Amino acid sequence: GLGVVAGRDVVIVANDATVKAGSWWPETITKILRAQEIAMRQRIPIVYLVDSAGVNLPYQEGVFPGQYGAARIFYYNSLMRRYLHVPQISAVMGSCIAGGAYLPALSDVIFMVEGTSFMGLGGPNLVKGATGQTVDGETLGGARTHTEISAVAHYRAPDDASCLDRMREYIGRLPRPAGVAHAVIESKPPAAEPAALYGMLPADHRLSYDMRHILDGLLDGGVLDEFQPDVAREMLCGHARIEGRPVAVIANQRGVIKGRPGERPKFGGIIYPESAEKVAFFIETANREGLPILFVQDVSGFMVGAEAEHAGIIRAGAHFVEAMATASVPKIVLTVNHASGAGYYAMAG
């Protein structure tokens, strides 16, 4: 249906998990496609509240075939994301299996809820039958798995109400219709005095410091709504405001960055394959949303070595550089310590 969220006209698609686990029937496909077409014609955001077991397999002969079968949903997802720049925001509100998982994965951003969200191509029972592996749902595809390990999802909330509140905040800062500027609100002073920034940086550029303290002196109220905070912590990405204007922020974190249990620490100021992919996705999203990007760089370059090469550092780095180079929004660069190597160029140098 159609509604208003945070003052914005939006299209909403929501599954009812009390009816056949929210599975897709032939009529479901027709309704989703119609909703997507309205969003594309009107150029308004579309919100997916997903709680679906995917296709109702006994009825798949009416779901898959034809020009307007289930695959067209994903075609429309891709059109909106790559060409039309129609914002797509998904919340995984329950179990999302197979096609129910691809729908949010093709959105711009994904919100998940701790303890109740599940997203995967197959559930624990299917995994047990297909591979013999016994795994619980949270480990297989829960909110922490997808916001800390797989990086498929981008924001994690403690409960449904918090998830919906965060979605409202996100929608409230989305780009306005063509020709209308982003909403500018009353500015707040930074959390730290800008003049104090000089005392925060070490005299020796090799020593560590917390980049968040630098951002405290730049951003309104020092507030950064961080994007994927538990993924690639050596790179900070997020949404903020400066003088009341919305901006996207990308910054290098310094020091030794602790990894997940069993994972080796990373060196701050170095771009790893995982951080390159995280930043590339964030740049592409900010570009679609028409947000200026502030790069706060303190970078020594890209990671080298056999492990980095095996992880595809060249491919990931190229994705980072391509996203930065092709973004058409304003890019502002602040070098706070030093910048060198290809990392300088990747960080919009």
Briefly describe each language-model feature range.
Residues 1-349:
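Ligand-binding clefts of soluble mixed alpha/beta catalytic domains
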